[in-house]
């Protein structure tokens, strides 16, 4: 570990004794509930909310109970998620995804896997040879509340690969992982910082001022509504409550361990988590702060634009200010210690630092040379946290050993650190009334930010700094003052005497005048006195009215506004666009509604993409067309298979073709997507023909699950199986249980797929049906009188099929498919335990 310097920034210039009266505790009080919201057509519920009328302070009680109430109701409007998806695929939840993601082997419908639910094996087009995502990647999709420092529910679907096959290699795991389509960059790079950062603060007031860099409401709002870096805010929450009875100074030691670095995609390319998308869909199109505030509670104020997975170590050590002063700690010792260095993992080397060590021991009231603090640890094993809460001043090796053990555990149990954030309203998309809801969520975030403004708090005495924590206010005291209201102790030097002014909360916005609205505030919380400084900032604030923006949105989305303003006449469905479709098409098109066209994958839209429903109930459509920007496979002749299979191919990509079913390829086998977006050579020159083997060529004998192709045995396709015994099996990749046959399981195993037999009752097998002669299975024979298939006796089996292991009457035995099918056909209960002969009989 490298040597680190400690900067002790405490000096005693002068003192002024303060005799302040104690402030009486103020208990939190709820305001009355707002009116009930409009009945939600999807959940058939309505909510109401109450805000805090009086914040608890000076040791008073916080508010008890929930801010929200919900009740059932009868909706007057339908559910927007019941609308269609146009040319795209509709998940069971109502969320729309590209049709190219259907039957690709990936569950792109986040919660229900509807895109893979009804796919036959022959329809599946696996888009990648691996499907294991990097460990803990789900953490990159969580929402984040910047005001509370807490991670919230998922807003990004980190499970979707988007049909892409992007891989990243982990040196620690010695394996490749498949990246989510929502991640732009994901790097496994362990960064352990050996240089511990630590600071010495002369009060909790100094600490909060340092960690909360934005103090005015306007600067807080500017920071809040732009992409910004953020670290955990929870450290400041507890600095004041722990030590109220004395004045304490803080020694803060911190460090980080990084395991992985990530960058999420731009918001327009992110696939939303289905629960979050549903909540966005359910938001009312008329502004109701209660409904939007509930979304903020569940999903936070921001989402993660980038960051690292790792661990964050921070410990706050409290030192009694008066005892430190009594031990004669002066700036002389500070300089001596600073010049020689001080480190908690090496022994003190200078006389000045030794004096500092003794002063810290005496001032912190430690015994056995142990300095105890309050740990704020993110990531790593929970069992290590208690061991990180103290430092042994005479045992630096022990300190290092405990820290290293925690740092090692971070690799397996990381959390998000060093996050860069983007406001949550940037993710409002792919829902009805998207522009209106995006505007309203931004407005709700502004109101939410105002709830945490310290203007709601009563003044702290002796220049203390108030902050809002939940439903109560805390006072962070200046050096050598303490108490619930900072009413006790002394102020040092030029801080004594005066009281600086503080802002009241902003008034409500005025009515719009010439497109602008204003609000005001006063410098009376508290007013400046005794030579104290006046408030910094403006007493009035003006901004553009939302009315103009809402009027513009009313033209784009008239159906999102009150019914009295919505036309009662509607246009038919928008005209079709070749190689394209309408985004978020919906089912109703009132006069004035605009729709936006987009193109299928592999095409780009040229022209004006917006069409408008005119007053004559006809669509006003400008010039537009979908221009090809990539190569698209033509309809291939029967028997030709292509690899890789993709919706489109960019210039320079190659495709190879082969023949199936014992056919051989005539013509070229490789094709290049050229700059003219045509295949070179032309694919029509490739076709499959029946290949006659030379008489002298030895014909290999293939297994039942194989077929002869180009003079060699290759795996059949499942649909090429002849009738075989029905079984239930679990796909170990997707964990889905499917009805298969013994033959199909052999074929899938031949192709490298991992399927495991399950009980017959675990899936729905095809019902037994009477079959005409000529379609009898192995265990059936033709009855001449009825011309129907009937059960064979086991002794009558002619073609036996596969040898399998079957449990009959509790005992396993090897028998042919025909014999097992004969028993099942006659109603006897059997269980297929292996698609191969029993192990005991093959040894």
Curated annotation (Swiss-Prot):
PTM annotation: C-, N- and O-glycosylated. O-glycosylated with core 1 or possibly core 8 glycans.
Extent of the signal sequence: 1-22
Domain MACPF per the UniProt entry, residue ranges: 124-456
Annotated stretches, region: Factor I module (FIM) 1: 695-770
GO cellular component: extracellular region; membrane attack complex
Disulfide bonds: 28-63, 39-73, 42-79, 85-96, 91-109, 103-119, 128-165, 337-353, 433-560, 455-505, 457-473, 460-475, 477-486, 512-545, 523-535, 571-613, 599-626, 631-673, 659-688, 702-713, 715-750, 721-743, 728-763, 773-782, 776-789, 791-825, 797-818, 805-838
Domain EGF-like, chain residue ranges per copy: 457-487
Region described as CCP 1: 545-615
Residues bearing glycans: 36, 202, 503, 506, 509, 696, 754
Residue ranges annotated for the LDL-receptor class A domain, each copy included: 83-121
Function as written in the Swiss-Prot or TrEMBL entry: Component of the membrane attack complex (MAC), a multiprotein complex activated by the complement cascade, which inserts into a target cell membrane and forms a pore, leading to target cell membrane rupture and cell lysis. The MAC is initiated by proteolytic cleavage of C5 into complement C5b in response to the classical, alternative, lectin and GZMK complement pathways. The complement pathways consist in a cascade of proteins that leads to phagocytosis and breakdown of pathogens and signaling that strengthens the adaptive immune system. C7 serves as a membrane anchor.
Protein name: Complement component C7
């Amino acid at each position: 570990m490298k040597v680190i310097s400690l900067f002790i920034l405490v000096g005693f210039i002068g003192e002024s004794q303060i005799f302040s009266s104690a402030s009486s505790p103020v208990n939190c009080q709820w305001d009355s509930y707002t009116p009930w919201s409009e009945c939600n057509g999807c959940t058939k519920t309505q909510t109401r909310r109450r805000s805090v009328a009086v914040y608890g302070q000076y040791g008073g009680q916080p508010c008890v109970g929930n801010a929200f109430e919900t009740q059932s109701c009868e909706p007057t409007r339908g559910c927007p998620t019941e609308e269609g998806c146009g040319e795209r695929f509709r998940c069971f939840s109502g969320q729309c995804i590209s049709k190219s993601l259907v039957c690709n082997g990936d569950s792109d419908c986040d919660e229900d896997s509807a895109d893979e639910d009804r796919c036959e094996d022959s329809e599946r087009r696996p888009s990648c040879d691996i499907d294991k995502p990097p460990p803990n990647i789900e953490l990159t999709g969580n929402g984040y509340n910047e005001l509370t420092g807490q991670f919230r529910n998922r807003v990004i679907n980190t499970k979707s690969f988007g049909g892409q096959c992007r891989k990243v290699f982990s040196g620690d795991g010695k394996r490749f992982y498949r990246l989510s389509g929502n991640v732009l960059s994901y790097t496994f790079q362990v960064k352990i910082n050996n240089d511990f950062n630590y600071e010495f603060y002369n009060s909790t007031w100094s600490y909060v001022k340092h960690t909360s860099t934005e103090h005015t409401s306007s600067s807080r709002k500017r920071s809040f509504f732009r992409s910004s870096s953020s670290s955990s805010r929870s450290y400041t929450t507890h600095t004041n409550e722990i030590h109220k009875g004395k004045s304490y100074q803080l020694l803060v030691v911190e460090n980080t361990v990084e395991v992985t670095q990530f960058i999420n995609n731009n918001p327009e390319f992110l696939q939303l988590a289905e629960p979050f998308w549903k909540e966005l869909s359910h938001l009312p199109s008329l502004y109701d702060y209660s409904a939007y505030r509930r979304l903020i509670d569940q999903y936070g104020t921001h989402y993660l634009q980038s960051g690292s997975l790792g661990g964050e170590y921070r410990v706050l050590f409290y030192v009694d200010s008066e005892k430190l002063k009594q031990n004669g700690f002066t700036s002389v010792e500070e300089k001596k210690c600073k010049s020689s260095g001080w480190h908690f993992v090496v022994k003190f080397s200078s006389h000045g630092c030794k004096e500092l060590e003794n002063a810290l021991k005496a001032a912190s009231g430690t015994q056995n040379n142990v300095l105890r603090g309050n740990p704020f640890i993110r990531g790593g094993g929970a069992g290590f946290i208690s061991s990180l809460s103290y430092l042994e001043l005479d045992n630096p090796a022990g300190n290092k050993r405990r820290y290293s053990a925690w740092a090692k555990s971070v690799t397996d149990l990381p959390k998000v650190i060093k996050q860069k954030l983007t406001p949550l309203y940037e993710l409002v998309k792919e829902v009805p009334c998207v522009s209106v809801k995006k505007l309203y969520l931004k407005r709700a975030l502004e109101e939410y930010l105002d709830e945490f403004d310290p203007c709601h708090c009563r003044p702290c005495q002796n220049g203390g700094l108030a902050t809002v924590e939940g439903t109560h206010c805390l006072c962070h005291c200046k050096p050598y003052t303490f108490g619930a209201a900072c009413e006790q102790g002394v102020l040092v030097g030029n801080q004594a005497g005066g009281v600086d002014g503080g802002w009241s909360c902003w008034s409500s916005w005025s009515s719009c005048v010439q497109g602008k609205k204003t609000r005001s505030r006063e410098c009376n919380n508290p007013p400046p006195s005794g030579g104290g400084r006046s408030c910094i900032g403006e007493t009035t604030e003006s901004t553009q009215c939302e009315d103009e923006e809402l009027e513009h949105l009313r033209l784009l989305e008239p159906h999102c506004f009150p019914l009295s303003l919505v036309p009662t006449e509607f246009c038919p469905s928008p005209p079709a666009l070749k190689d394209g479709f309408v985004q978020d098409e919906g089912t109703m098109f009132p006069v004035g509604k605009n729709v936006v066209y987009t193109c299928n994958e592999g095409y780009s839209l040229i022209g004006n993409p917006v069409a408008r429903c005119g007053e004559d109930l006809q669509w006003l459509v400008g010039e537009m067309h979908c221009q090809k920007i990539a190569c698209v496979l033509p309809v291939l002749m029967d028997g030709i298979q292509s690899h890789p299979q993709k919706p489109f191919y960019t210039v320079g990509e190659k495709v190879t073709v082969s023949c199936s079913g014992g056919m051989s390829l005539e013509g070229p086998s490789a094709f290049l997507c050229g700059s003219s977006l045509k295949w070179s050579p032309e694919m029509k020159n490739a076709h499959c023909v029946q290949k006659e083997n030379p008489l002298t060529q030895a014909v290999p004998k293939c297994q039942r699950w194989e077929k002869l192709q180009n003079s060699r045995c290759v795996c059949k396709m499942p649909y090429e199986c002849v009738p075989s015994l029905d079984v239930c099996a679990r796909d170990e990749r997707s964990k889905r249980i499917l009805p298969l046959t013994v033959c199909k399981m052999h074929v899938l195993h031949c192709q490298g797929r991992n399927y495991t037999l399950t009980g017959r009752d675990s899936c729905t097998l095809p019902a037994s049906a009477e079959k005409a002669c000529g379609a009898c299975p192995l265990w059936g024979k033709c009855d001449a009188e009825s011309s129907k298939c009937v059960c064979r006796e086991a002794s009558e089996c002619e073609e036996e099929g596969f040898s399998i292991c079957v449990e009959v009457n509790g005992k396993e035995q090897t028998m042919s498919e025909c014999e097992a099918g004969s028993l099942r056909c006659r109603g006897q209960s059997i269980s297929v335990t292996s698609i191969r002969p029993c192990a005991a009989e093959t040894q």
